[in-house]
Regions:
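Domain-length cofactor-binding catalytic modules of enzymes
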Residues: 1-148
Length: 148
């Protein structure tokens, strides 16, 4: 949580699943972003693109907050049971993957996430963000976790 000023009032803003996207001219911007706005990254899945965006002046309507990812369309458990290793290979295309096994990546399958292009389109159509660049993944490295 962070203390921030909105409409002359100090508020405690807690962003869960969101990130700050300060527009141009916002007093909390570092000097290097004062004229442009502070870039925010909105990641897609490990097999799709991610975007770097700028908040517009309308972003103040959301306390200068924007979602910090595409969002899931299915749970990790469902993704593990719904997708096969072969499905994952198709979904990943030419993205290089390094993991202890393809099975360990199933819960992060690209089709378990919303379409990042549609998410960005919605934010732009709502007048909240302006996309600067779309990034495409070249490789994914998944470390070992405690999951089985």
């Amino acid at each position: 949580a962070k203390r921030e000023r909105y409409s002359g009032r100090w508020l405690l803003v807690h962003r869960k699943g969101a990130t700050r996207a300060l527009p141009a001219g916002h007093e909390d911007n570092p000097s290097c972003y004062r004229d442009t706005g502070h870039p925010a990254i909105i990641p897609g899945s490990m097999g799709t693109g991610s975007y770097v965006v700028l908040g517009t002046h309308r972003i103040k309507d959301t306390f200068c907050s924007v979602n910090h990812g595409a969002g899931r369309v299915m749970s990790r458990k469902r993704a593990k049971s719904e997708f096969t290793k072969e499905d994952l290979v198709k979904q990943m295309g030419h993205v290089v993957t390094i993991a202890r096994s393809m099975k360990s990546l199933l819960d992060e399958a690209p089709l378990a996430y919303k379409d990042i292009d549609e998410v960005i389109f919605t934010l732009v159509e709502a007048g909240l963000t302006k996309p600067l660049v779309k990034l495409s993944p070249m490789g994914v490295l998944k470390g070992e976790g405690s999951e089985g």
